[in-house]
């Protein structure tokens, strides 16, 4: 069944398309969208896709997500396309890509890293050191992390 038969087009907001089948809920969790924000969100799971066989789609009405916000989902949805919708038209389309730097979102896995010390208010920071597959290094202790380890 086509996605159009399941959910209609949105007027303004963001459509995350070409999510690997079955990962839409994980994408929402990573984006921190729980439903409690009051945003209208539509989820389409396991619909036909020419490129992927099957895919998931997330439609968020009334909020334009920035590349910085969505690039983090590249760990679970590297194939995702982000469409910004205004007045029912796609005005921007971009593919997710691993972020060059991630600040403040995730904890370093090294228990002795200064960012994990109880009285050190240091913001965890990770730099991208390899793009394919994405690998990050902690700016403080040098521990390497795959994006999947951080999530
Ligand atoms: N979409 C939507 N509401 C709109 C416009 C588009 O929900 N007002 C959705 C479409 O249903 C589709 C995605 O946004 O899932 C991208 O739309 P579009 O670029 O028109 O589709 P395609 O050309 O098929 O996209 P692509 O080339 O990225 O596969």
UniProtKB/Swiss-Prot annotation:
The keyword Cell membrane does not apply. Binds 1 zinc ion per subunit. GO terms for cellular component: aspartate carbamoyltransferase complex. Keywords: Metal-binding, Pyrimidine biosynthesis, Zinc. Zn(2+) binds at residues 108, 113, 138, 141. Coiled coil: none annotated. Belongs to the PyrI family. Contains catalytic and regulatory chains. HAMAP family: Asp_carb_tr_reg. Involved in allosteric regulation of aspartate carbamoyltransferase. NCBIfam families: ATCase_reg. This is Aspartate carbamoyltransferase regulatory chain. It comes from Pyrobaculum aerophilum (strain ATCC 51768 / DSM 7523 / JCM 9630 / CIP 104966 / NBRC 100827 / IM2).
């Amino acid at each position: 069944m086509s996605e159009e038969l399941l959910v209609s087009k949105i007027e303004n907001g963001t459509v995350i398309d070409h999510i690997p089948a079955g990962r839409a809920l994980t994408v929402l969790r990573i984006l921190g969208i729980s439903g409690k924000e009051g945003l209208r969100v539509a989820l389409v799971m396991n619909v036909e896709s020419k490129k992927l066989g099957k895919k998931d789609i997330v439609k968020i009405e009334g909020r334009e997500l920035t590349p910085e916000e969505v690039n983090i989902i590249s760990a679970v949805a590297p194939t995702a396309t982000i469409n910004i919708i205004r007045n029912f038209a796609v005005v921007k389309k971009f593919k997710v890509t691993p972020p060059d730097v991630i600040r403040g979102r995730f904890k370093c896995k090294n228990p002795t890293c200064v960012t994990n010390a109880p009285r050190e208010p240091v913001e965890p920071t990770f730099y991208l050191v390899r793009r394919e597959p994405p690998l990050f290094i902690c700016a403080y202790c040098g521990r390497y992390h795959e994006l999947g380890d951080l999530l």
